[in-house]
Regions:
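N-terminal subdomain of nucleotide-sugar transferases
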Residues: 1-61, 65-67
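Conserved donor-binding/catalytic core segment of Leloir-type glycosyltransferases
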Residues: 4, 209-229, 235-242
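A short, histidine- and acid-enriched strand-loop-helix "catalytic/donor-clamping" loop
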Residues: 11-13, 131-152, 164-167
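Short N-terminal targeting/anchoring amphipathic segment
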Residues: 101-121, 135, 270
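Short alpha-helical donor nucleotide-sugar binding micro-motif in glycosyltransferases
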Residues: 263-268
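Aromatic "clamp/platform" in nucleotide-sugar-dependent glycosyltransferases that forms part
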Residues: 276
Length: 284
C-alpha cells in the first residue's frame, strides 16, 4: 500500500532526535512492505528563534527535500505566528503548499494519508485527502488535546479537524475519552496504547550500596528546555533525596536518539519521568 505520512515533527538532518515517534511509525510501516513518503511542514523562522524550543532545532535551515534512511521527505514552509493568534494565516498558507506537495508527489498517488498531530498538519492532510479522494487518519499524541484545546485560538480548528478525519487514533485511554467528548463516534476511534517492551518488565535489582551517604545516579531522560517534561519537579526530587542523606547526581539528555535514551535508562540507578503528558515509555 502507498501511504503518505504528514507530520509537524520528523527527524531533520541536524536534529535526528526530533519526532522519533513518527520515524518509528514509518519504519514499522516500511518493514510491513508499505511504500511510504513523508511530508513534514515546517514554520518559517530565523535561526535565533530555534532556541525557544528543542523541537525547533534545525528547522530554520532545513533542506527542502532530503532522505531519512530510505524514506523521501519534503519540508514545505508555512506561515504561522507563535501561539497561532490568527489561525486563518496558517490555514491560507497550508492551502498554498497543498499544490507544492501534489507537484512533488508527481504520478505517485497514496491510497491513504496518516497524519501525526492535528494542528496545523491536519489541515494539510485534510486538503490533500479531499483532492485525491482518499481517507486520512489523524493521530493524537497529547499536545493537541492537552494544550491545543485549552487555547481559544486553536481549539475550534482542532475540533474541526478531529471531526473531519475518517479515523482518529489515540495513544491513551484518557485521550480516547476526550475524543468521544468532542463528538467522535466509537466506530471511527482507534485506541492504540504504547506497549511496554519485555525488557522493562524485569524486577528491580537488589541495591548493593549503602542506603545513606551513597551516590545515586538519577537520569532525567528528556530535554529540560521542554516545559511539559517538568524538569523542575525532577530537581525538587533530587533536593529531597539530598536532604535525606543521599549524594545525588542528575543527568539530562538533550536531543538524543531513542536508542541512546533507552541504553541510559538501563544503566541509571533511578530514572525520573515527571511529565504529566507521557502516554507511553518515553518520548525524549
Amino acid at each position: 500500500m502507498r501511504i503518505l505520512v504528514v507530520s509537524l515533527l520528523f527527524p531533520l538532518p541536524t536534529n535526528v532526535a526530533r519526532g522519533t515517534f513518527v520515524s518509528d511509525n514509518v519504519k514499522l510501516l516500511e518493514s510491513m512492505g508499505h511504500e511510504i513518503k513523508v511530508v513534514n511542514p515546517l514554520p518559517r523562522m530565523l535561526k535565533y528563534q530555534e532556541s525557544s524550543r528543542s523541537t525547533l532545532t534545525g528547522v530554520a535551515r532545513a533542506p527542502k527535500q532530503f532522505t531519512h534512511g530510505d524514506t523521501e521527505v519534503i519540508t514545505p514552509r508555512f506561515w504561522g505566528l507563535p501561539g497561532h493568534p490568527y489561525p486563518s494565516i496558517t490555514i491560507r498558507s497550508m492551502k498554498r503548499i497543498t499544490k507544492k506537495v501534489q507537484s512533488w508527489l508527481g504520478e505517485w498517488r497514496p491510497e491513504i494519508i496518516i497524519c501525526h498531530t492535528i494542528w496545523p498538519a491536519g489541515d494539510l492532510a485534510s486538503r490533500l485527502a479531499k483532492q485525491m479522494g482518499i481517507p486520512w487518519v489523524g493521530i493524537v499524541h497529547g499536545h493537541d488535546f492537552d494544550v491545543g484545546l485549552k487555547d481559544k485560538n486553536t481549539s475550534g480548528q482542532i475540533i474541526r479537524l478531529v471531526n473531519q478525519c475518517d479515523h482518529l487514533v489515540t495513544v491513551s485511554s484518557r485521550l480516547h475519552s476526550i475524543a468521544k467528548e468532542l463528538g467522535k463516534t466509537a466506530s471511527s476511534l482507534i485506541s492504540c496504547h504504547t506497549a511496554v517492551e519485555d525488557e522493562w518488565l524485569t524486577k528491580p535489582k537488589k541495591w548493593q550500596g549503602r542506603w545513606r551517604k551513597s551516590k545515586l545516579d538519577i537520569l532525567f531522560p528528556a530535554d529540560p528546555r521542554r516545559r511539559e517534561k517538568n524538569h523542575f519537579l525532577a530537581l525538587q526530587t533530587g533536593e529531597e533525596l539530598e536532604n535525606r542523606g543521599w549524594i545525588v547526581g542528575i543527568t539530562t539528555l538533550r536531543q538524543q536518539p531513542r536508542t541512546i535514551v533507552w541504553d541510559r535508562m538501563l544503566v541509571a540507578d533511578l530514572t525520573l519521568i515527571t511529565s504529566k503528558r507521557e502516554s507511553g515509555p518515553l518520548v525524549a
